Amino acid sequence: EDGTTVDSLTVTAKKAPEREAIEAFVSSVSDQTANRRLGRWDRKVCPGVMGLRNDYAQLMIDRIATTATEIGLEVGEPGCKANMIIIATAESDRLVRQMVKDHPDAFAKYDSGIRRSRRDLDAFVASGAPIRWWHVTARVTADGQRYKLGDDVRVREVSRLRGGTRDDFATVIIILDARRVGTLRFSSLADYIAMVGLAQVDPDADTAGVNSVLNLFGDRAAGVEPVEAMTAWDKAYLKGLYEARRDVRRGAAQEGDIARTMGEELAGEGEKKKGE
């Protein structure tokens, strides 16, 4: 015997690194609305593409539609009024400045509870990113009734955790700068646009080290071969967002829902690979 005696031992289990990585990804990617919640499309989305050849535009719409359908959304028929507007241009800086000047209501409707900060709008205008995006969200009741500030509305089931209202996307504007985008796989470009069009992604999200289509431009700049399409992480995030509670008071509750769903989905992916 070495004379060493252990009277008691307390073991505190740490979260698996995977769980911590998932929570960090969700926290970084999620960009909350002015109401401090996570917005999403309600039931239907209609992507429209301008500035690309018709065949490429249709391919992009089809790819977005496939992802939208997978997360339970309906996609508008051909000719529907676009609410996810994708514009490709060689002069994105000039175009964005002109759009904000000529159509201010397309970016912030001050009487509808969908206003984001002027700082956010200034950052959108000043962005030199290959792709930039702007989400306009509408505050609605839990059963989908839109209202303006000051309106009388019937709100059900308000509690400490549930707010009785939610944030739905009204319009998403995505600007693609053809010169800055350069040469990329079309599948990865279309999936990047689908990701930022279906979720309110933080333009400053730090997703380095995660296998995600959101690293498309960062990987290229670092000399790393970008992914070819949405990854399991991206798809799990979207699934989590569209299954998360919507009428919560704070986005943190939604982020928790997303992280749980991602954990389940990614664990399933791991088991699937083991069995292959």
Show which residues each predicted segment covers.
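Compositionally biased P/S/T/G-rich terminal and signal peptide-adjacent segments
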Residues: 15-41
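Short, flexible turn/loop "capping" segments at secondary-structure junctions
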Residues: 4, 37-42, 166
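Long, folded non-catalytic interaction modules
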Residues: 48-63, 68, 72-276
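N-terminal secretion/transport leader regions
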Residues: 4-15
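Long, contiguous hydrophobic alpha-helical segments, chiefly transmembrane helices and signal peptides
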Residues: 26, 41, 45-49, 64
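Hydrophobic beta-strand segments of well-ordered beta-sheets in folded domains
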Residues: 7, 43-47, 172
